[in-house]
Each structure stands twice: as C-alpha cells, then as structure tokens.
Amino acid sequence: MEKFTDLNYTLSVITLMNSTLHTILEDPGMAYFPYIAYVLTVLFTLHKASIPTMKIALKTSKCSYKVVKYCIVTIFNTLLKLAGYKEQITTKDEIEKQMDRVVKEMRRQLEMIDRLTTREIEQVELLKRIHDKLVMQSTGEIDMTKEINQKNMKTLEEWESGRNPYEPKEVTAAM
C-alpha cells in the first residue's frame, strides 16, 4: 500500500508540474522560460552529481586539493560548453602534460628527419660513386694485350730454364 501511495504522490506531482508549465507557457511574457528551465536543470544536475562525487573523491584521495581543483575545473568547463564556448579552462598539470606530449612528438619528428637525412646523404654518396665509375675517361691508346690475353706471355728466351714449361715431358713407366 505504501508503494501505491508513493506512485500516486509521484503522479500527482508530475500532473501538478505539467499544469504549472502549461499555464506559464501560455503567458506571452515568459518567452525565455525554456532557457531559464534549461539552465536551472543543468545547475540542479551539476549540484546533485558533484556533491556525492566530491565527497567520495575527498575520502578516497590522498591529495584533496587536486581533486577539488579538478572537479571545479570540470564544472566550469561544462558550463562553458553549455554556454557555447569552445575554449576550456586547463590546469597547470594538463598544460605540462600537453607540453610533454608536444616535446615528445617534436623529438620523434627530429629523429625521423635525422634518419632520413642520413639515408639521403648515403644515397647521394652512392650515386656519386656510381657516376664516377660510369664516367668514361679518354685514353690516348688502348692496350689490347688485355683483350687477347697476351700480356703475361713469355718467349722461349724469357723463360728461366730456357725450355717451355707447358711442353709435354717423356714419361717412362716400370714394368
């Protein structure tokens, strides 16, 4: 029976609010009512959501100052978003985190540029060596002894013992 009474009470409160809203909205002087209701709803929601959150955070956190600061910054950022601003309030910790992230990214970019520069220098040196090998140098007379394989040929007089080492020798076998 108690639950039924609570349900009737809730329904009567909703009916009362609806009738009140209809009478207010019929009045032409209340053109800004939806905006006022919107702001009040947001403030009420923030109030109801932030107080228990702050209590839990303060009990469980070791550093209550940072928690309070973070909650206040979050509330103000929410209000700024609701007002249509794109800017946000940031704490020093967030700024330091963002700066560290930017510095890390810059270091990574510099390392990549250094690696690419080193590779490009190596490629240029390799291309220079290839070019130097491909460049034809003009010579007055071409030595053809290399081409016909006669550079190291010796005549009979030039051999040390005076006989041709490539000539077959007589071999006798014992029977």
Swiss-Prot record:
Main location: host cell
Superkingdom of the source species: Viruses
Chain ranges passing through the membrane: 29-51
Record-level GO cellular component terms: extracellular region; host caveola; host cell rough endoplasmic reticulum membrane; membrane
Localization in the cell: Host rough endoplasmic reticulum membrane; Host membrane, Host caveola; Secreted
Keywords carried by this UniProt record: Activation of host autophagy by virus, Calcium, Enterotoxin, Glycoprotein, Host endoplasmic reticulum, Host membrane, Host-virus interaction, Ion channel, Ion transport, Membrane, Metal-binding, Secreted, Signal-anchor, Toxin, Transmembrane, Transmembrane helix, Transport, Viral ion channel, Virulence
GO biological process: monoatomic ion transmembrane transport; symbiont-mediated activation of host autophagy; viral process
Cytoplasmic side: 52-175
InterPro entries: Rotavirus_NSP4
Gene3D superfamilies, per database record: 1.20.5.430
Binding site for Ca(2+): E120, Q123
Membrane-protein topology: Single-pass type III membrane protein
Modification(s) after translation: The N-glycosyl content is primarily Man(9)GlcNAc, with a small amount of Man(8)GlcNAc.
A single GO molecular function term of this UniProt record: channel activity
Family: Belongs to the rotavirus NSP4 family.
Subunit structure: Homotetramer. Interacts with the immature particle in the viroplasm. Interacts with host CAV1, early and late in infection. Interacts with host integrin ITGA1/ITGB1 heterodimer. Interacts with host integrin ITGA2/ITGB1 heterodimer. Interaction with microtubules blocks trafficking to the Golgi apparatus.
Domain observations: Binds 1 calcium ion per tetramer.
UniProt cross-references to HAMAP family, sorted A to Z: ROTA_NSP4
Protein name in the entry: Non-structural glycoprotein 4
Species of origin: Rotavirus A (isolate RVA/Cow/India/Hg18/2000/G15P[21]) (RV-A)
